[in-house]
C-alpha cells in the first residue's frame, strides 16, 4: 500500500467511535487523512437535546490525538431542503419514512463528496459505516458489513457504483467490540461513547414533542378491527404499523388481555385501526409493491428474480420473488407471510452478501382472511 501516501482521504467525523477508528485505520494504511465534521441542523439547539457541540468536541479530541486536521462545514440548508422537508411531507400523509436513508443519499454521500472534491481536494471520502465495497468488472458493489449485528447496507442502498468507487469503509471488516477495543487501546475520547439512535443528525429527541412542533396535531379515534372505539390518538403521524407501545389502551370488554397492535391507518376518517395479538391476520402481508427504485451497480430488472429482502433495519432477510411491473415498480412476493410491512419504509434486496438496491414500499398485499 506504499502508494496510498499520495492519496488524500477525508473522513466524515461524527464524534462517534466508528468514524474515529476509521480515521486511524486509514492512517495505518498510509493514506493522507483529514477529518470533516458536518453540522446539519440549526433549529432549537438547546442543551437538553442537542449533542452537536459535544460531538464536535469529541471529533476535535480524536483528531488531536491522531494528529490530523479537522474541517467543519454547515449543510443545514441542504439537510432541511432535501431531507427534512420530505420527512415531514411523508408523515403528513400517513407514511413512515426513513430519514437516515435519505440523509445518506443527499448529505453524507452527495454534499459531503462534492465538498471534499471541490474544497478539500480529496481522492476518497470515508465513513464509519459497517459495509464493504468490492470492485467487480470495473464497477463497485456494496456488500454487507462482516458484523451481522451492525451491518448498515440497508441504509446505503441508494448509492451508485460511481459514488462507491470514491468511498472507503475501513471498519466494514470488523466487529463492533473490536472497534471499541482499538479505540480504547489508542486512548481515543470516543472509546466508550454509546451509539446514537436518534434521527440522522437531529439527535436524541423526544420524537412526539419534536414532530408536534412542525406538524399540526389531529386527534382522532382508535378503533378495533370490528369497529369498536377503544381509545383516542393524538395524531396518526405518531404511530406506525406493528406498533404496540404508546397506545394507552388495555384489554377489551370481552376479557381478552392480549396487547393491541396498530394494523392500519384510515386517513380519510383520521382513525387508527388496531387489533389484538402480534400475529393478527390484518397485520400480516404476503407481499408488497415498491417504487422509486435504485440499483447499486446492476441494470434494472427485466425478469423475475429470486432473492431476499429486508423491510426494516436489523430484521432477518425474507426470501422472496421480485417481479418487475410495466409501470416501473416491483412486485415482491414473500415465501411466508410477514408482519408489519410499512408504506414509506424501504425494501432492500440482497443476493447473499451483495446489496442489489431497493425502493420505497408503496403498498402491501394483505393476507386474505
From Swiss-Prot:
Cystine connections: 103-200
GO cellular component assignments: cytoplasm
Region (Interaction with target base in tRNA): 98-100
Catalyzed chemical reaction(s): S-sulfanyl-L-cysteinyl-[protein] + uridine(34) in tRNA + AH2 + ATP = 2-thiouridine(34) in tRNA + L-cysteinyl-[protein] + A + AMP + diphosphate + H(+)
Compartments reported by the entry: Cytoplasm
Top-level enzyme category: transferase
Catalytic residue positions: 103, 200
GO BP term, example: tRNA wobble position uridine thiolation
Matches recorded under Pfam families: tRNA_Me_trans (PF03054), tRNA_Me_trans_C (PF20258), tRNA_Me_trans_M (PF20259)
Cited CDD domains: MnmA_TRMU-like
Protein residues bound to ATP: 12-19, 38, 128
A GO term for molecular function: tRNA binding
Region (Interaction with tRNA): 150-152, 312-313
Keywords recorded for this protein, A-Z: ATP-binding, Cytoplasm, Disulfide bond, Nucleotide-binding, RNA-binding, Transferase, tRNA processing, tRNA-binding
Transmembrane segments: none
E.C. numbers: 2.8.1.13
UniProt site positions, description: Interaction with tRNA: 129, 345
Top-level taxon in the UniProt lineage: Bacteria
UniProt function note: Catalyzes the 2-thiolation of uridine at the wobble position (U34) of tRNA(Lys), tRNA(Glu) and tRNA(Gln), leading to the formation of s(2)U34, the first step of tRNA-mnm(5)s(2)U34 synthesis. Sulfur is provided by IscS, via a sulfur-relay system. Binds ATP and its substrate tRNAs.
Entry's family note: Belongs to the MnmA/TRMU family.
Complexes and interactors: Interacts with TusE.
Entry protein name: tRNA-specific 2-thiouridylase MnmA
Taxonomic path: Bacteria, Pseudomonadati, Pseudomonadota, Gammaproteobacteria, Enterobacterales
Gene designation per UniProt: mnmA
